[in-house]
């Protein structure tokens, strides 16, 4: 698994700005108000050919309000889960008691992890001189950087990636299919895994996963080796509910990063909730296969029309994620558990298929004959041919006279046609339009 680098420090020292620079994102909210990054963000990053994950956290502080307590717990959780820590301070505001507390905490409780002490907002030689006072933290080799301008960040990242262990959880290169069991707390993830594997006689091995206390279980189904990434069973160390929720979310994000297909469990009695949608969207945005499993279906009073009505209601709520298949299961009665695994295997098979260019262009010509694109500003979009680009998920490239002439409704039309024609249910894919 990719190493995890956590950015920690008190509020408003520039963690989100550094996060955005490292990941080339603009997703984290950057504001001058202390503590504005209320939640965490995890994004993939790459430096000199080495891939890793970066986590942006809320600020470390001691205020008595609930948000600050939650942010403190999230910071401690992030430090515990991280492989490498970048500890940020602000040269302009000087050394504070919170900085000293964090330094003491890192040296006392997390001295087994690489910690890079970064003095941020150093935009002039004078500020670099003032930054020398930060050696009082006990970190005698500070890195002087400007996350805003980028100065010093490259040298810092060189050191960070050099610290990654050669075997820092790199996934074994094999042909196994990785399925992540994810969902909100108490939707039945543990019951699902126990019911699925409790009577399975083809288990190859159980071994500790790379996410600390998670268990990766290998088993075979119809001749295919499967790695089940289980995110159930939170550790009992979190001191407050917010910490438990944060830890759950962290494990979910890391499981999604590792998997081929995400099996998202929801509670049939509770229905599709906002947090369920966030988890589904997270998997879809990462271009993972997605299968929605409605657990505890045995508790629902039903007739022959119930599942259809239930599905229709969920698809209404899911909006443009209506391409995700739904299955009804019961971990308690073991109903449809292996059917769900088979569906996930089918999704991965479709996700990894490579369609020939000749087949794609026959499809394209038929599509253009039936429904050619409309003109825009008096100009006509002419799509010449298409091909599939090799990637972990399907990526289709269209070569045309001017990509700016493409209208959103026609792009959605092509997406729908491709999904139907190539049976991409549960499979996110990308369309790219290039000028030629």
UniProtKB/Swiss-Prot annotation:
One of its GO terms (biological process) is ribosome biogenesis. Residues 353-436 form the KH-like domain. SUPFAM superfamilies: P-loop containing nucleoside triphosphate hydrolases (SSF52540). Keywords: GTP-binding, Nucleotide-binding, Repeat, Ribosome biogenesis. GO terms for molecular function: GTP binding; ribosome binding. Gene3D superfamilies: 3.30.300.20, P-loop containing nucleotide triphosphate hydrolases. Coiled coil: none annotated. CDD domains: EngA1, EngA2. GTP 2 binds at residues 183-190, 230-234, 295-298. InterPro entries: G_ENGA, GTP-bd, GTPase_Der, KH_dom-like, KH_dom-like_a/b, P-loop_NTPase, Small_GTP-bd. It comes from the Bacteria. Residues 3-168, 177-352 form the EngA-type G domain. GTP 1 binds at residues 9-16, 56-60, 120-123. HAMAP family: GTPase_Der. GTPase that plays an essential role in the late steps of ribosome biogenesis. Belongs to the TRAFAC class TrmE-Era-EngA-EngB-Septin-like GTPase superfamily. EngA (Der) GTPase family. Associates with the 50S ribosomal subunit. This is GTPase Der. The lineage of its organism: Bacteria, Pseudomonadati, Chlorobiota, Chlorobiia, Chlorobiales. The gene is der.
